[in-house]
């Protein structure tokens, strides 16, 4: 066992007390990204090593692996703690997204080590989708590169507001303050093009030598700021989901017996309490919350992020993919939306194609009406294209087979994030972030009932040879 972990358990008074203490620590999810060979895996290995999160057998194995696959001569190659795939060790690069967990006395952490190569952009986007902070590594010898800009853009596109720019390999530039200042100014000039109100920090460090990672560097007396670990431990993440409107996507209808009917899922945002009036979309039927059932028993009130089962006072028709929200909120269903897409398939995305999509437990079909532009993520310019290639990022117009209830991704990632699924292979081929829902269903709802709209979508989906027109716009 890790001796530090054993000491912590002893100090807490046993395993059970230690586990309870861990549960009450805040959790920070962050990723490391940057250009190839900037030292991302080495940095994570250094964090694990200096916070004493490595077990004795892992340390022994690391000594042996460093001799066979290491790139640091006689020193320990800490990157091998993270690069687990054989291909990664042989090439000395990161390919897959590697997740690691560690904790300190102040906070728990989940790290996503993402690849730096451009052909693995889809892997990087996958890792960033669940993170709240991004560490952007920059090689002090090379400065801000195109891949640095690319990863910065993807991180902000996926809703990350906290960026830590770690200027690595300071030992190779003699710990020069001038180099640090120049790179800092270059990045701030570029960051002015990034969307959103960002919190950007800068830390000069050497992942290989451990300078300013978990302890203050004696080689850089000119830097008086926080170490990287101190930044991670103290950064305040604004989790605003509790203050947002209630969103409860139904994942499962729970019917264990004739006397119980509950709707299970995770509360995506807001809060819900017993007695609250709620509305079911897209049907619009209203009811009251009779019970809130959790693993620990019934609760009177729950908040965003909790897995719950809601029991309503009325027996109404609710199925997987329906959305519950506060009854007094007006959220119209939409038939179309503009979506920021990260394409992940060899076959490019082209106008006219149809895909199955999945969003907040709801599975339906969407057609690509057009591609407005592709983003050149090396310089953040937009260009017109006929299709979106592998690893391409662009703004795409979609039309759905049925009205959906959507939020902008920046407002709610659960009800604003979707995936594209190939209808033949059932493989996930793309990820989408709702840029702007296009309210068309509202205008048509006065002319057609919800049943007529659903029947129309059903006929067009299964009997296209009938030539039925789209009631929401004859598309």
Curated annotation (Swiss-Prot):
It catalyses: sulfate + ATP + H(+) = adenosine 5'-phosphosulfate + diphosphate. Residues 25-239 form the tr-type G domain. Residues 168-171 are annotated as: G4. Coiled coil: none annotated. GTP binds at residues 34-41, 113-117, 168-171. Heterodimer composed of CysD, the smaller subunit, and CysN. NCBIfam families: CysN (TIGR02034), PRK05124.1 (NF003478), small_GTP (TIGR00231). This is Sulfate adenylyltransferase subunit 1.
């Amino acid at each position: 066992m890790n001796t530090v972990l054993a000491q912590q358990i002893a100090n807490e008074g046993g395993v059970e007390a230690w586990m309870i203490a861990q549960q009450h620590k805040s959790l920070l999810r962050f990723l490391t990204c940057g250009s190839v060979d900037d030292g991302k895996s080495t940095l994570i290995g250094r964090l694990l090593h200096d916070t004493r999160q490595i077990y004795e057998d892992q340390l022994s194995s690391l000594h042996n692996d460093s001799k066979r696959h290491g790139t640091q001569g006689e020193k320990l190659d800490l990157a091998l703690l993270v690069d687990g795939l054989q291909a990664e060790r042989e090439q000395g690069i990161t390919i897959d997204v590697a997740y690691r967990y560690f904790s300190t006395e102040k906070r728990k952490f989940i790290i996503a080590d993402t690849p730096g190569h451009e052909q693995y952009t889809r892997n990087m986007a996958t890792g960033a989708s669940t993170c709240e902070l991004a560490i952007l590594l920059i090689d002090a010898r090379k400065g801000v590169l195109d891949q640095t800009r690319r990863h910065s853009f993807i991180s902000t596109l996926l809703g990350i507001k906290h960026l830590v720019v770690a200027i690595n390999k300071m030992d190779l530039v003699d710990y020069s303050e001038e180099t640090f200042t120049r790179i800092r100014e270059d990045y701030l000039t570029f960051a002015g093009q990034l969307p959103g109100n960002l919190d950007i920090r800068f830390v000069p460090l050497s992942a290989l030598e451990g300078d300013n990672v978990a302890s203050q560097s004696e080689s850089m007396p000119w830097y008086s700021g926080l170490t990287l670990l101190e930044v991670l431990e103290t950064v305040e993440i604004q989790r605003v989901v509790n203050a947002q409107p209630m969103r409860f996507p139904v994942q499962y209808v729970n019917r264990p017996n004739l006397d119980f009917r509950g709707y299970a899922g995770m509360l995506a945002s807001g809060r819900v309490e017993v007695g609250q009036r709620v509305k079911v979309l897209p049907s619009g039927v209203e009811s009251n919350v009779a019970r809130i059932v959790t693993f620990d028993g019934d609760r009177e009130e729950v908040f965003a992020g909790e897995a719950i089962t809601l029991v309503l006072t009325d027996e109404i028709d609710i199925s997987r993919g329906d959305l519950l929200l506060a009854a007094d909120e007006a959220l119209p269903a939409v038939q179309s939306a503009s979506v920021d897409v990260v394409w992940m398939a060899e076959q490019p995305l082209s106008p006219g194609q149809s895909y199955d999509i999945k969003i907040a437990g709801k599975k339906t079909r969407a057609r690509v009406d057009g591609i407005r532009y592709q983003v050149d993520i090396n310089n953040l310019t937009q260009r017109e294209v006929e299709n979106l290639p592998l690893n391409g990022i662009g703004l795409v117009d979609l039309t759905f087979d049925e009205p959906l209830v959507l939020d902008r991704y920046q407002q709610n990632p659960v009800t604003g994030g979707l995936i594209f699924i190939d209808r033949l292979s059932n493989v996930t081929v793309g990820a989408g972030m709702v840029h702007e829902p296009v309210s068309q269903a509202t205008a048509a709802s006065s002319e057609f009932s919800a049943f007529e709209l659903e029947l129309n979508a059903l006929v067009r989906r299964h009997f296209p040879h009938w030539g039925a027109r789209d009631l929401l716009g004859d598309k």
